[in-house]
């Protein structure tokens, strides 16, 4: 082998490559364990409307500090994911001295019961928001996405009559009740909800609107008609649609 020039040349190249790799690895280890390359800036990016920016900044300082190679990127990401208003987060290094945090905030569209909110994807999260007039959803755990979908469908139909939804309930027996923004409850039941709601809007346009101040609820669960209650203590009155 020692007399083979070609083999010696290959061995020399291999040794040089190995030395270069060892030097590079040693350099990285030295940088990783040194106080060089400190994080000097944390850049928070995202359209943040509801989040506490001061709290988010404090969260960054808790995890992102020291050598940029050793700073706890994964810990920071997990901490931001636990923050109620944050829907998604991406934390990345920007050499030589910056860590960038890109945040996507939840957009609240409804209240979930008395203590939580629903975002635009139908996810429930616990946060405080002082916004009067938001619709309230009441349903079993795991039904928020379906309730949001139905809310959009129901709202489209009701808006044609100038009506909105104040509260919507999806009962344990899979029945739908809707409280309108004028305080009237519409009972749709557990089947043919859209058909019943359209029948309600027709009845509203031609019959019920003129008596709206006297109505407590309208029950649309009848096959050929509906019933109304004029006062909390009154008796229901059957109205035929035919």
UniProtKB/Swiss-Prot annotation:
<keyword id="KW-0812">Transmembrane</keyword>
<feature type="topological domain" description="Cytoplasmic">
    <location>
        <begin position="1"/>
        <end position="12"/>
    </location>
</feature>
<keyword id="KW-0997">Cell inner membrane</keyword>
<dbReference type="GO" id="GO:0032153">
    <property type="term" value="C:cell division site"/>
</dbReference>
<dbReference type="GO" id="GO:0090529">
    <property type="term" value="P:cell septum assembly"/>
</dbReference>
<feature type="transmembrane region" description="Helical">
    <location>
        <begin position="13"/>
        <end position="32"/>
    </location>
</feature>
<feature type="topological domain" description="Periplasmic">
    <location>
        <begin position="33"/>
        <end position="242"/>
    </location>
</feature>
<comment type="similarity">
    <text>Belongs to the FtsQ/DivIB family. FtsQ subfamily.</text>
</comment>
<keyword id="KW-0132">Cell division</keyword>
<dbReference type="GO" id="GO:0043093">
    <property type="term" value="P:FtsZ-dependent cytokinesis"/>
</dbReference>
<keyword id="KW-1133">Transmembrane helix</keyword>
<dbReference type="InterPro" id="IPR034746">
    <property type="entry name" value="POTRA"/>
</dbReference>
<keyword id="KW-0131">Cell cycle</keyword>
<keyword id="KW-1003">Cell membrane</keyword>
<dbReference type="InterPro" id="IPR005548">
    <property type="entry name" value="Cell_div_FtsQ/DivIB_C"/>
</dbReference>
<protein>
    <recommendedName>
        <fullName>Cell division protein FtsQ</fullName>
    </recommendedName>
</protein>
<feature type="domain" description="POTRA">
    <location>
        <begin position="37"/>
        <end position="106"/>
    </location>
</feature>
<dbReference type="InterPro" id="IPR013685">
    <property type="entry name" value="POTRA_FtsQ_type"/>
</dbReference>
<comment type="function">
    <text>Essential cell division protein. May link together the upstream cell division proteins, which are predominantly cytoplasmic, with the downstream cell division proteins, which are predominantly periplasmic. May control correct divisome assembly.</text>
</comment>
<dbReference type="InterPro" id="IPR045335">
    <property type="entry name" value="FtsQ_C_sf"/>
</dbReference>
<dbReference type="Pfam" id="PF08478">
    <property type="entry name" value="POTRA_1"/>
</dbReference>
<dbReference type="Pfam" id="PF03799">
    <property type="entry name" value="FtsQ_DivIB_C"/>
</dbReference>
<dbReference type="GO" id="GO:0005886">
    <property type="term" value="C:plasma membrane"/>
</dbReference>
<comment type="subunit">
    <text>Part of a complex composed of FtsB, FtsL and FtsQ.</text>
</comment>
<dbReference type="InterPro" id="IPR026579">
    <property type="entry name" value="FtsQ"/>
</dbReference>
<keyword id="KW-0472">Membrane</keyword>
């Amino acid at each position: 082998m020692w007399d083979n020039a070609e083999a010696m040349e290959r061995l020399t190249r291999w040794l040089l490559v190995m030395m270069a790799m060892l030097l590079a690895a040693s350099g990285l280890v030295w940088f990783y364990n040194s106080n060089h390359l400190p994080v000097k800036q944390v850049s928070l990016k995202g359209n943040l409307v509801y989040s506490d920016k001061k709290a988010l900044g404090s969260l960054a300082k808790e995890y992102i500090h020291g050598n940029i190679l050793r700073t706890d990127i994964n810990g920071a990401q997990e901490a931001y994911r636990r923050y109620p208003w944050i829907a998604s987060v991406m934390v990345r290094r920007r050499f030589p001295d910056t860590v960038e945090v890109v945040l996507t905030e939840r957009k609240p569209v409804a209240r979930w019961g008395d203590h939580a909110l629903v975002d635009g994807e139908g996810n429930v999260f616990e946060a405080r928001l002082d916004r009067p007039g938001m619709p309230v959803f009441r349903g079993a755990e795991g039904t928020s996405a379906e309730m949001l979908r139905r809310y959009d469908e129901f709202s489209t139909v009701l808006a044609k009559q100038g009506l909105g939804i104040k509260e919507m309930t999806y009962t344990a027996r899979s029945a739908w009740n809707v409280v309108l923004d004028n305080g009237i409850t519409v009972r749709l039941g557990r089947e043919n909800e859209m058909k019943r709601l359209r029948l309600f809007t027709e009845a509203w346009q031609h019959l019920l609107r003129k008596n709206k101040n006297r109505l407590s609820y309208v029950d649309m669960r009848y096959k050929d008609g509906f019933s109304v209650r004029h006062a909390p203590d009154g008796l229901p009155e059957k109205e035929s649609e035919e």
